[in-house]
A protein has these predicted regions:
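Short, intrinsically disordered N-terminal pre-domain segments
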Residues: 1-6
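Short, surface-exposed, charged amphipathic helix/loop patches that serve as local interaction elements
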Residues: 14-103, 114-206
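Residue-level detection of beta-strand-connecting loop/turn positions
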Residues: 7-9, 110-112
Length: 206
């Protein structure tokens, strides 16, 4: 993600949990307000700018950001683009995986792991988190939400790696979201494969 301030361009790099936390807190607090109000207070705008500064790793100060984003629309737009960037990175990872069809593979610490069969026990752990977090109104995730996703990933992969190892590997928030969503994609892919194989068991058609 890029931003231009006072004729200088900056890149955010990975949007880590530390960077994301401030943004998520501000986004959630303003989301409800946005439904009932069409304006933002000075404090609201300050918090948006602070979140932008943090997402860009404090490469510029609050004052520099506030001066560079000299229109209200610029503050709101660049703040909103943070979520768009995360979704864009998630989509890029999905496109790369679609090329390889490796929906049951995750790389942790330079090593590839396969999820193996997803039975009821593993599926239950995933489903509980999925049902709580994947809803139309859910736009951001707390640290606890992200922890739950990572724990579900670890369990789906039969604890072949630890939570700590997975959390270190999935440093970008988009990586956590993507690999969690990939679990469902893998189940759907396996269903399609099994359905294709099962056709030979159907009665012959006249």
């Amino acid at each position: 993600m890029k931003i231009s301030l006072n004729n200088k361009e900056y890149e955010s790099g990975k949007i880590t949990r530390e960077k994301y936390k401030k943004f998520a807190e501000v986004y959630e607090s303003l989301l409800g307000k946005e439904k009932t109000a069409q304006t933002f207070s000075d404090d609201d705008l300050d918090r948006m700018v602070e979140a932008i500064v943090q997402v860009f790793g404090n490469q510029f100060t609050f004052e520099e950001a506030d001066d560079g984003l000299d229109e209200i629309s610029s503050i709101i737009l660049n703040f909103s683009l943070i979520n768009a960037e995360i979704m864009n990175n998630t989509n890029i990872q999905a496109e790369e995986t679609a090329k390889t069809l490796k929906t049951n593979i995750i790389t942790v610490g330079g090593k590839e792991y396969e999820s193996g069969k997803i039975g009821r026990k593993k599926y239950r752990a995933f489903r509980e988190v999925y049902d709580d977090l994947v809803t139309p109104e859910k736009q951001t995730y707390t640290d606890d939400d992200l922890d739950r996703m990572v724990k579900a990933i670890v369990e789906i992969y039969d604890n072949q790696f630890t939570f700590k190892e997975a959390n270190a590997e999935l440093a970008d928030v988009s990586q956590i979201i993507f690999n969690f969503a990939l679990i469902n994609a893998n189940i759907i892919k396996r269903l399609a494969e099994q359905a294709k194989d099962a056709k030979k068991n159907l009665s012959s058609q006249v």
